[in-house]
Amino acid sequence: MNALARSLTVFIDRALEPIRPWLEDDQVVEICANGPGEVWVERFGQPAMERHEVSSLTEHAIRHLAERVAGHSGQSVNEEHPLLSAALPTGERFQGVMPPATTAGGAFA
């Protein structure tokens, strides 16, 4: 991995901080945010997703995360290109939706 790729990975890692507890949980199979302030988590074997309030997951934090993931994958996410389909450096799928495609302040799964 070259220096640029390493630095992008560090920035993504920092941007993932609001959802870190669920990323590190081996029972979690899906993490979704349908806007600022809350996360929905699906755990292996559970019948429904769990809702969690996450005050640090602001509109800015969602946009920042999407921009970092986009940069890592050689893409951009902005008002002209509000949809992002990429992967995190560790291989997890990342789908992002930013305004104006959503009015909720951004979303990801």
Feature annotation, model-predicted:
Residues 1-53:
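N-terminal anchoring/assembly modules that precede and organize ATP-driven motor systems
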